[in-house]
C-alpha cells in the first residue's frame, strides 16, 4: 500500500478477512478498534476480521506498507466503510 502525505484510508471493517500490516517506509498512524497508535518502519500490527480500522499518513513523506490478507473471502466488496473522505 502506498499512502501519500496527508492521506488516509476510510474507517472500515471487513466481515470475512483479517489483515496484517507491515510498515516498510514512513510512519503510519493506526486506528484499531478504540486504540490509536503509531507504527514506524519494520513494525507491524494484526487486524482481526470485524475490527474497525484505519491507516493515516500524517507525515510529509510517503508511507509504504505491505498488507497481507487472510480469510475465506478476500474480495474488495467485503468492506463496511464508516468514514470515507473519498465518498465511496
Please report, for each region that a protein language model flagged, where it lies by residue:
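Glycine- and acidic-residue-biased ligand/ion/polar-headgroup-sensing regions
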Residues: 15-34
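Short acidic-glycine-tyrosine-enriched beta hairpin
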Residues: 32-52
Amino acid at each position: 500500500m502506498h499512502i501519500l502525505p496527508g492521506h488516509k484510508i476510510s474507517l472500515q471493517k471487513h466481515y470475512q478477512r483479517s489483515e496484517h500490516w507491515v510498515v516498510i517506509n514512513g510512519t503510519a498512524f493506526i486506528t484499531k478498534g478504540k486504540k490509536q497508535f503509531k507504527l514506524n518502519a519494520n513494525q507491524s500490527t494484526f487486524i482481526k476480521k470485524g475490527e474497525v480500522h484505519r491507516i493515516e499518513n500524517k507525515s510529509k513523506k510517503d508511507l509504504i506498507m505491505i498488507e497481507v490478507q487472510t480469510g475465506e473471502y478476500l474480495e474488495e466488496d467485503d468492506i463496511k466503510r464508516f468514514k470515507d473522505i473519498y465518498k465511496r
